[in-house]
Amino acid sequence: MRLHWFSIFILMTASLVLVHYLPFWKDVEFGDETTYLGSGLSFSIPFKGGVQWGPLYAAWYAFWHFFIPDSLNLYYFNWALLSVLAGISVFIFVRSLGVSLAAATWIAVLFLFSDQNVPLNPKISIAPFCLILGVLALIQLRPWSNSRRFLVISLVGLLCAYCRPEFYISFLLALIIAVFWLWKEKGILQPTLMRWAGVFVILAVGLHLLFGNPLFTGDDNRSTVAFQQHFVVNYSAWMNQPEPSTIEAQLQLFHKVMGENVHTLTDAIKMQPKWTFKHITTNIVHTVTANLTNVVSIFYQTLFRGWYSPWRMGVAAGIALVFLFLIDYKTTVRNFRKNPVDGWGFVGLITLLIPTLIATVLIYPRTHYLIFHLVLVLWLIAYVLSRLSLRKVKIMQPFSAAFLALLVLSIFVTIRVPEYHRKAPTPTADNVRFITQLTPKERLRVLERDWYRVFLKDNSDWIHVEEYTDGDFAKFVRDKNINFILMTQDMQSYFGKDAGFASFLNQYKSEGFVKLPTNSEGAYLFIKQSLL
């Protein structure tokens, strides 16, 4: 029992080390995550953000927003909380599969500090990642029948679908399997079977009524746009040319290569099979190599991060050789024979992962899809470790061996403290802090390329930079009634060669603007004097 408490202490300490100083070294990252944040800040039923844009994740943000009113603090809190929950979920999952306490703690801590955790953006993928690990652990720990197991798996698939819509496939597949087992087990489980099925139906129908169908919807299909964008990513690499910098340019290039009538993957297969086949085979190669890279990153790069001596490969090889020497191979083989794979449990795992396996092959192996492949990697590792038997070493009893492993892990966590207890430039967060301190007297009309408007206290109107086309920037500002222009480094680069903007720089005062520095990296704000 003391060993269990020591393990929990190490896991909690590692989590604290990882996130306690997060706002001081991690900058805000714009993109889909800030879209979800914005949906959470303005969350309502019916959900206005669109059923394919994570309504359940937006509700999660909305819940925490009750306790954390400041949007920037909410952003960092969510990032930290999900990072910690991911590590805890990994620990519970591998423990449920029979991995020893010390090994499970090591695996969880290495994941916590890996590049697959805190750096992962958008963070929304961690939510279904935790749900999947949680339900897979639950069906291992509870002596449930297969009908109950797949009802729970199906429900979790539906919950995940309201974070990432592709998981609706998991919901449907698990539901089909659950119906099969309900029919097969109806005679055995009659007293409680209908109660389980009834609860499932109520929850599933309720979620559909609240949010709608996340996959088969009349809204603009995210998968279609994602396919077009990521075909362009591959095409640009094949042609050894830079990727287009805007979504509009990406879609233009897609139709230039594939044809104006090609929109979906099905269209591409019919009309451009050669390009489509090359796209898919490229994705398969990238998926395999990326997953191998992630495994090496977690269990090697994370372990030796900060120590770049040429000896570290030798040390890693030495540790591996000692471990291989300590294995009792005869007993291990016997364990594999005695403990077969939980076949239907594995089917449940694959059912939950199928959408991401398909997505990486047909669309692109993006990091927020690959995180789910790690579930399969963890399962394989747990399958092997739970059946390994080590030789008995006279000088070391089982308890002392486990204690020593955890003691070494505690030293590893301590070494990580300086890496995460530091300050680093956070220019985007500094911009957010500056603009949220303002109290404008009128509604803001914002010209920007990022998502700063999400953090503004009051509602604002977003003017797209692509609307500026005539070369007279001052006239454009007047015509659009723009009163807020945040000139980040990205905006300065975007307008850097524009003569109309250069002219505006010399006359902004006459247009009623003042110029305010917003961070130490050279960003500044043009804001109408009348707003202050």
Language model region names:
Residues 94, 229-243, 405-455, 460-472:
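Membrane-embedded, lumen/periplasm-facing catalytic core of multi-pass transferases
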Residues 35-38, 169, 193-264, 439-454:
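Juxtamembrane membrane-water interface segments immediately following transmembrane helices
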Residues 22-39, 48-64, 70-73, 218-226, ...:
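Extracytoplasmic catalytic/substrate-binding loops of multi-pass membrane glycan-assembly enzymes
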Residues 102-105, 148-155, 175-176, 194-205, ...:
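Signature aromatic-anchored transmembrane alpha helix within multi-pass, membrane-resident enzymes
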Residues 73-77, 120-121, 276-350:
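Membrane-interface anchor segments at the N-terminal boundary of transmembrane helices
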Residues 41, 126-132, 160-164, 169-173, ...:
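Hydrophobic/aromatic-rich transmembrane helices and adjacent perimembrane loops
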Residues 77-98, 134-136:
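Transmembrane-helix motifs of polytopic, lipid-linked glycan transferases
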Residues 5, 90-116, 131, 147-150:
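Transmembrane-helix signature of polytopic, membrane-embedded enzymes
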